[in-house]
């Protein structure tokens, strides 16, 4: 049996609140206005909604927001709560710890006895609710089911809930989150009087076995979660609050993993034939900040699986980040706004940072007359060697991002806690390996046979461009108070020794095309990380431009280098054997580069 979304409803409380009006609702923040400006610029949110007045009084319950979204969807479909056989809800935090959120929404909604399910979690809990509703219809248990995602977070964002010790991991969320609810009606047949969305398939997977907790409440810090350490173990809620346990927090040091696992799952769905990028007409992606959009675009593009941005739809800027409700709030505007036409294929993507989950839903827009057409087609074409290579390299990069997130110095940079000593140590250790970069590229060029003269010329040009890069590191080191003699006579750490030895070994072979995998990792660090790191380091340490020249230069130069590299990776040079060797070398270099950075804290 097939399930169809036959109506979508949303509810956003109060009037839209602009950035200039935020403090009149949340009150003055305990941290600097500089942080607020930086977060608002990064997240791209211009308007949001709060179930709260200007005096800080909560005006509605979370269950009320959910009820209004459900009623909006049912009314649009011409149904009432008495027609509903199952109600599934998703939210981060209900109004009460007990009972379940779905029971509270049902109590307010009415409609007689029905099956209820409360999905816990963060952003993916809305999709979890949808999957439950879909399953209940597919299995023939219910004719009509409703799924709703709802969030009421504003009451936890008021300044009087925060102290100077709240910490950046809690404070920055004040400018990211807002209130709202979205709901969908799921039925066994398309609606007879308009368009419906056939649910072709849905996919939700957790990667919690690979990652620590990222977004949480109820503990002082994620690493301290153990028996006797949670908020329920304190003598009173006041004591838990005093320790900051009741704040919603997000570990920004590992947050970027969310992009990597999302793209990793996306590539898997493409390879299984469930997603065919060229056949997707609309992509609705939930992301908490515009900052992540460019990262998603870069990884999809590098994998050769990009869905053109003109097919993307988001209302983050105008509706805010409403967590579990966001994907439904987005779908409501697109569906009810006439964005879809019969035959259109829609892909929903929802990553969740709680402990790293990601979900996808594939929909097809149908009219009643064609609602019984077959499921979405899979990919039948054989995968070319270059296509396979680009997808494999994207997976290597995604796993490399995970490795980097566990490196202490990277976590400190990403979380805003790096010190000048950290930056000095980073420069010192990079310099010893960077100095040899041009040498191994030159050796590789000398071992490229005359049959590949154009590629040899590319290697030689690249070596010439990088032969004096280490001098920029020397100057940066001195500019932040380091001794030139110390950095010029420094030794490679064990990770750098292993990396250099591997690179020279590979470069000494005939036609060492596998080193394109090494370049993919090393140049990718410059293109994807250097610019971000230099911005964070400059802000954290209040450095001038002449103190961050190396990272600044490589943020731009490596982008140009990667463009040339991708031309080669897409060329006729690539056979399956060469592609496999490139992927193998990329994996090795990724691990050794991470080891090089890990060893900074062991020096």
Language model segments and positions:
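Non-heme di-metal
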Residues: 382-603
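Short glycine-rich phosphate-binding loop at a beta-alpha junction
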Residues: 82-90, 277-286
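Short acidic, glycine/serine/threonine-rich loops at helix termini
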Residues: 17, 98-100, 131, 156-161, ...
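Condensing-enzyme catalytic core mediating Claisen C-C bond formation in acyl metabolism
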Residues: 1-60, 168-256, 351, 362-379
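Claisen-condensing/thiolase-fold acyl-transfer catalytic domains that form or cleave C-C bonds
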Residues: 63-67, 93-95, 107, 112, ...
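Acidic-glycine-rich active-site phosphate/pyrophosphate-binding loop
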Residues: 37-41, 96-110, 152-163, 229-238, ...
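Short beta-strand segments
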Residues: 9, 90, 120, 145-151, ...
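Flexible, glycine-rich active-site loops centered on histidine and acidic residues
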Residues: 138-180
């Amino acid at each position: 049996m097939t399930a169809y979304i036959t109506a979508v409803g949303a509810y956003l409380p109060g009037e839209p609140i602009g950035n200039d009006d935020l403090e009149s609702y949340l009150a003055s923040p305990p941290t600097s206005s500089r942080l607020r400006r930086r977060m608002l610029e990064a997240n791209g949110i211009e308007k949001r909604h709060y179930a709260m007045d200007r005096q800080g009084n909560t005006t509605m319950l979370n269950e009320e927001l959910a009820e209004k979204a459900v009623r909006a969807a049912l009314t649009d479909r011409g149904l009432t709560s008495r027609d509903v056989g199952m109600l599934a809800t998703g939210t981060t935090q209900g109004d009460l710890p007990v009972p379940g959120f779905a029971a509270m929404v049902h109590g307010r909604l009415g409609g007689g006895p029905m099956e209820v399910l409360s999905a816990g979690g963060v952003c993916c809990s809305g999709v979890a609710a949808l999957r439950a509703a879909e399953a209940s219809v597919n299995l023939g248990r219910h004719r009509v089911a409703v799924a709703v995602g709802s969030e009421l977070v504003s009451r936890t964002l008021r300044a009087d809930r925060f102290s100077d010790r709240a910490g950046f991991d809690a404070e920055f969320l004040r400018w990211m989150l807002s209130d709202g609810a979205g709901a969908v009606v799921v039925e066994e047949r398309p609606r007879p009087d308009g368009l419906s969305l056939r649910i072709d398939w849905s996919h939700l997977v957790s990667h919690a076995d690979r990652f620590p907790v990222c977004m949480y409440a109820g503990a002082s810090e994620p690493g301290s979660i153990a028996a006797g350490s949670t908020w329920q173990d304190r003598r009173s809620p006041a004591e838990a609050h005093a320790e900051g346990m009741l704040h919603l927090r997000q570990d920004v040091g590992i947050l970027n993993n969310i992009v990597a696992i999302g793209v990793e799952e996306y590539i898997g769905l493409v390879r299984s034939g469930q997603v065919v990028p060229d056949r997707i007409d609309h992509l609705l992606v939930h992301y908490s900040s515009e900052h992540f959009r460019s990262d998603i675009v870069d990884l999809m593009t590098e994998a050769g699986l990009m869905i053109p941005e003109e097919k993307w739809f988001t209302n983050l800027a105008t509706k805010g980040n409403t967590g579990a409700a966001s994907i439904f709030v987005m779908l409501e505007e697109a569906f009810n706004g006439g964005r879809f036409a019969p035959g259109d294929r829609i892909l929903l993507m929802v990553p969740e940072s709680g402990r790293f989950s990601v979900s996808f839903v594939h929909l097809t827009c149908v009219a009643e007359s064609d609602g019984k057409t077959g499921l979405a087609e899979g990919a039948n074409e054989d995968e070319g060697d270059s296509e396979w290579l680009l997808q494999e390299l994207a997976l290597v990069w995604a796993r490399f991002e995970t490795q980097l997130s566990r490196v202490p110095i990277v976590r400190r940079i990403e979380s805003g806690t790096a010190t000048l000593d950290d930056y000095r140590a980073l420069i010192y250790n990079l310099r010893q390996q960077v100095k040899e970069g041009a040498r191994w590229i030159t050796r590789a060029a000398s071992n490229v046979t005359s049959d590949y003269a154009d590629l040899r010329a590319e290697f030689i040009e690249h070596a010439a461009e990088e032969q004096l890069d280490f001098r920029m590191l020397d100057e940066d080191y001195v500019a932040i108070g380091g001794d030139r003699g110390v950095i010029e006579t420094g030794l490679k750490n064990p990770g750098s020794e292993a990396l250099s030895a591997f690179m020279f070994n590979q470069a000494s072979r005939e036609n060492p095309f596998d080193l394109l995998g090494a370049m993919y990792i090393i140049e990718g660090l410059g293109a994807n990380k250097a610019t971000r790191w230099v911005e964070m380091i400059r802000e954290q340490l209040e450095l001038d431009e002449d103190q961050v020249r190396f990272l600044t230069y490589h943020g731009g130069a490596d982008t140009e280098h990667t463009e040339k590299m991708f031309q080669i990776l897409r060329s006729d040079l690539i056979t399956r054997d060469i592609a496999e060797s490139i992927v193998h070398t990329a994996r090795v270099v990724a691990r050794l580069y991470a080891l090089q950075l890990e060893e900074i804290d062991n020096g």
